[in-house]
């Protein structure tokens, strides 16, 4: 019975430990910020990179396509916004679905299993006119929630990018579902400052991509957690609660049958 309860509780325990680890990584990132001079120099380099990227009109690929991992200015790309030398650019915060995850270079499988990946050939996430950063993560993993609750977001929801000591605010202005090869909505648009969050959908099938796009808005001090109404109805939570309940029911059923058999044998 104990083993069954442990198995049923595994997703919740695993996700809790993962989120604690992410918080430690974010705290470490915030303490490793560069000096003002270094930051200004780095940001200028990133702005130049983003300008060159926009001018090059490069091809944007599906974040989950292993064949599309090559990127514009690859060597330079890996060194930019690499504060802790571990590929972490900054972190993403989505208050309404209680997400705080590190953002890393690239969308390789190792990145997507452990955090949010920045899609190569899209703008680095420092904001500015004529930029469009694309951030992706998995949904539906049994041991981590990641972007599973992205489907709960609505137009008007605000999310934040924390990078180099600054907080950039984005208001969700468009939510769409596309086929994986249709990446037109991920391209840079002149004069616009966008960030698009991407994950697989529908839950458990993953045949399409869910895009949650945010437009840049002025940052104002965030509400406290108590004032923010968290979005409810998580499929991740619902699925594993059902699984846990079913597991516990089966355990008690077998225990009950076992006791009945023993009594009849006496």
Describe the role of every protein-language-model region:
Residues 1-237:
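Solvent-exposed, non-transmembrane regions of membrane-associated and secreted proteins
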């Amino acid at each position: 019975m104990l083993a069954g309860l442990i198995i049923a509780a595994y997703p919740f325990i695993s996700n809790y430990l993962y989120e604690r680890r992410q918080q430690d990584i974010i705290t470490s990132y915030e303490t490793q910020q560069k000096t003002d001079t270094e930051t200004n120099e780095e940001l200028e380099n990133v702005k130049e990179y983003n300008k060159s990227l926009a001018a090059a009109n490069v091809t944007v690929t599906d974040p989950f396509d292993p064949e599309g991992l090559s990127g514009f200015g690859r060597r330079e790309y890996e060194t930019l916004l690499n504060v802790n030398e571990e590929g972490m650019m900054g972190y993403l915060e989505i208050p309404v679905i209680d997400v705080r995850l590190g953002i890393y270079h690239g969308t390789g499988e190792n990145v997507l299993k452990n955090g949010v990946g920045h899609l190569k050939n899209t703008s680095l996430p420092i904001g500015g006119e004529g930029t469009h950063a694309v951030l992706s993560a998995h949904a539906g993993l049994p041991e981590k929630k990641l972007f599973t609750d992205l489907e709960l977001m609505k137009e008007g929801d605000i999310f934040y990018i924390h990078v180099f000591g600054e907080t950039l605010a984005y208001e969700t202005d468009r939510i769409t579902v596309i086929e994986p090869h249709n990446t037109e909505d991920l391209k840079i648009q002149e004069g616009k400052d966008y960030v698009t969050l991407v994950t697989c959908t529908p839950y458990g099938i993953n045949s399409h991509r869910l895009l949650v796009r945010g437009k840049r808005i002025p940052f104002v001090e965030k509400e406290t957690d108590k004032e923010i109404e968290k979005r409810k109805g998580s499929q991740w939570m619902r699925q594993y609660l059902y699984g846990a309940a079913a597991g516990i029911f089966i355990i008690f059923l077998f225990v009950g049958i076992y006791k009945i058999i023993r009594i009849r044998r006496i």
